[in-house]
Structures are given as structure tokens and as C-alpha cells.
A protein has these predicted regions:
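Hydrophobic, aromatic-rich membrane-embedded alpha-helical segments
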Residues: 71-89
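Membrane-helix exit/interface motif
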Residues: 20-33, 52-61
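Individual transmembrane alpha-helices with interfacial aromatic-anchor signatures
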Residues: 115-136
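Membrane-interfacial, low-structure loops and terminal tails that flank and connect transmembrane helices
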Residues: 95-121
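Juxtamembrane boundary at the C-terminal end of a transmembrane helix
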Residues: 137-153
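Membrane-cytosol interface at the C-terminal ends of transmembrane alpha helices
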Residues: 48-61, 83-91
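Core segments of transmembrane alpha-helices
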Residues: 11-21, 49-52, 128-135
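Loop-to-helix transition at the N-terminal end of transmembrane alpha-helices
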Residues: 34-49, 153
Length: 153
């Protein structure tokens, strides 16, 4: 899986969960028929949002994105559907080209983030476990902090 494929899949997943959450919000606040859509898709969207943000940082390290581009990629997860726009914008500028430069036989890592990435690329099963644990831990923190907006209605 290339940086482009990883990033695109999560950008599309993030936009899709936005659509599902917005549908749930219409059902809850517009038609007042059910809160189930917000309860289910809110959680799903939160998990995918976190995964997208982690993947953005992971790809940014590999692609040597500037802080500005990385921040734009992260902020694109906030407005609905902007992750897909950012994905296309980054691809048009060749910001998602190539493979994993720090994979075995590739460049030697120089910074701490690059060393972490090289370790993860050399151990994909362990990396997947670390990624899942990171998403779970950040989701737990988000649940403890509470929803981004008041849930009273």
C-alpha cells in the first residue's frame, strides 16, 4: 500500500462518515425520528477522524510535507468532505507520489519521527497494532472529554 492509497482510503472514509453523521443529524434534528444515526455514526466518524489525522501525520513524515501542508491536511478533516478535496489538491501537486521512502532498502531515517516510521514500516503487523491502540486510546480520551457540541436537545 503506497502513501497515496493509504491517504486516499482514509480521506474517502472520513468524508463518507461525515455524510453518515450528517444524515443522522437530519434524522435527529430535522425529522425528530431517531437519535440512533447520531449515536452510531458520531462514534464511527470520530474513530475514522482520528485514524485520518494519524495517517496524515504518517504520510506527511514520509512525503516531507511542510508544516503548512500538514496542518492543511489535518484541518481538512473538520469541514465536511474537505479531506477528499485535500487529497485531490495534494495529488495534483505530486505530494502523494512514490512509495515509502524509509522502508527496508530505502533512505536512512534521520529524525525521531522518521525512525518511528522506519520501525513501523519494517514491522507492519506491529505497526497495525500500534495504530489500532493509538486510535483506541485517542478515542477513549475524546469520549472522556465529551462530545464536540452539547448533546442536550
Amino acid at each position: 500500500m503506497t502513501p497515496l492509497v493509504l491517504f486516499r482510503r482514509l480521506a474517502i472514509a472520513e468524508a463518507t462518515t461525515w455524510a453518515l453523521l450528517l444524515t443522522g443529524m437530519v434524522l435527529k434534528y430535522g425529522t425528530r425520528t431517531t437519535e440512533l444515526g447520531v449515536q452510531v455514526f458520531g462514534m464511527v466518524h470520530g474513530v475514522v477522524f482520528i485514524a485520518y489525522c494519524l495517517a496524515t501525520v504518517f504520510v506527511a513524515v514520509n512525503q516531507r510535507w511542510s508544516a503548512r501542508v500538514t496542518l492543511l491536511g489535518l484541518v481538512s478533516a473538520v469541514p465536511p468532505f474537505m479531506t477528499v478535496w485535500f487529497d485531490r489538491w495534494a495529488e495534483r501537486r505530486d505530494l502523494l507520489e512514490g512509495g515509502w521512502r524509509l522502508a527496508s532498502g530505502g533512505e536512512a531515517p534521520r529524525s525521531v519521527p522518521e525512525k518511528v516510521q522506519a520501525w513501523m514500516l519494517a514491522r507492519p503487523v506491529a505497526a497495525a497494532a500500534v495504530a489500532l491502540l493509538a486510535v483506541a486510546a485517542l478515542t477513549t480520551v475524546a469520549l472522556l472529554v465529551g462530545p464536540p457540541a452539547s448533546s442536550s436537545s
